[in-house]
Amino acid sequence: MARILITSAIPYINGIKHLGNLVGSQLPADLYARYMRGRGHEVMFICATDEHGTPAELAAAKAGKPVEDYCAEMHEVQKEIAAGFRLSFDHFGRSSSARNHRLTQHFAGALAENGFIEEVVERQFFSVADNRFLPDRYIEGTCPNCGYDKARGDQCENCTKQLDPTDLIDPRSAISGSTELELRETKHLYLRQRALKDEIEAWIDSKTDWPVLTTSIAKKWLHDGEGLQDRGITRDLKWGVPVRKGSEPWPGMEGKVFYVWFDAPIEYIAGTAEWADANGKADADWERWWRTDRGAEDVRYVQFMGKDNVPFHTLSFPATIMGSREPWKLVDYIKSFNYLNYDGGQFSTSQGRGVFMDQALSILPADYWRWWLLSHAPENSDSEFTWENFQSSVNKDLADVLGNLVSRVTKFCRSKFGETVPAGGSPGEREHQLVAELQQRLAAYEACMEAMEVRKAASELRALWVAGNEYLQSAAPWTVVKTDPEQAQAMIRLALNLIRLYAVISRPFIPDAAASMMASLGCEDWSWPADVGRALEVLPAGHGFTTPEVLFRKITDEERAEWQTRFSGVRS
């Protein structure tokens, strides 16, 4: 049994996330966590809300609430929606937790002690209209790289280029929109990433199995232009982790907080500590996942994120870990994703464009969305959500292929043999061929899941469903029953067991449907099918079942047209 630590990029607290956010991090991370648990491995799956920095302050101000109250409220909202999508976190934490405060301050102290922090007096934009310094995300302007006119002072969300506020063309305050900005002196802490460049580069070069998307972004930022730069890790804000050197005050840093991108990844560790606290466990129980001197040396650590988060996870966070000179676990594999676009344009939380997670759940259950998003995950290139494609995928894959098999088998058995697994007959050559095909396809599915090739895994799973349908079509038990009822019973006995097999292997993708299938079969045996032949004998003759309701309903043309109009791209 392996030990697998999984973290999803933590979503900003500023509002409900859209489907592009979901498929770029949390959902594929959940798929992998569910699969690994299903294979019997020990899994720790951590996520949290990212609550500090400019986005939280601006969103709270817009909502007319104190930032602490806003964050507490939105954490519960995001937690509830995550549960609605059946995201199986072991803990969904908060970056504003006391654990994260202490750990962030601890890392800063360790970095300073090792000479990787520099105090820098810099010139920063001060808004005369707002009477305050403007940290990077409080400034908007035109990106000098791609021309996007809503680029932020830390990064352009259009081309992903990291920026400094002074790089922006025609900068303006994100608070008031004022362009009356002055450059004034202020002192900040910088993480000396350039001093760690050789270590970081050697570490990245050692990851020969990483996706091209991950390594290409990391190496681009290591080498393009002037290469890896030192990074400011403090801000002139009120809301955040107060700057301290470990447990001690940091002279000259009074009233400042750590930059959100310094403390946010540390929440992966702190969130695991929060899990221990919430479950009455000792520090040793979370440290065995993170400290290589306390049991984490055999842990495989996998991160999931959108491509815009890759630089922080391949450069800045590893620099924090390495520079601490403490035995913390570094990530083993980073699964990154391109963007999911929406109906001819971009999803955007800041612009309110696209289908958002709460809206999605209000019209269809989670499994419909999970299946489409995962089977169309933007792995090798950007992908696009269209209502026509969504309707087609749901109707063909879920309703016609899987749902139809479950319905036909259970209803036919009920009408001919009752709601018990029939006892007659024995498998023939056709059944043996099916078992061989399923065994081969299952191995391909497992290989894709192990490799985190999400779209290919969905394709292999669908092929497994199709194989069962093709068997039923060729075996035709509804015809055979007229001349050889014993053989028809053997076919249906295998087909009922096939439903259980599909429930087990489909659970990572469509957990609610899998649970419904198992409940209708009156079965609680979720063991992974190492041997397909044996797996198709789990339900014995005489075992009772109930004929389920429709597993997946079809989306009508009228519904598709109505939703397309309702979600035309702007969230009010």
From Swiss-Prot:
It is found in: Cytoplasm. One of its GO terms (biological process) is methionyl-tRNA aminoacylation. It is an enzyme of class 6 (ligase). It catalyses: tRNA(Met) + L-methionine + ATP = L-methionyl-tRNA(Met) + AMP + diphosphate. ATP binds at T349. Monomer. HAMAP family: Met_tRNA_synth_type1 (MF_00098). This is Methionine--tRNA ligase. The gene is metG.
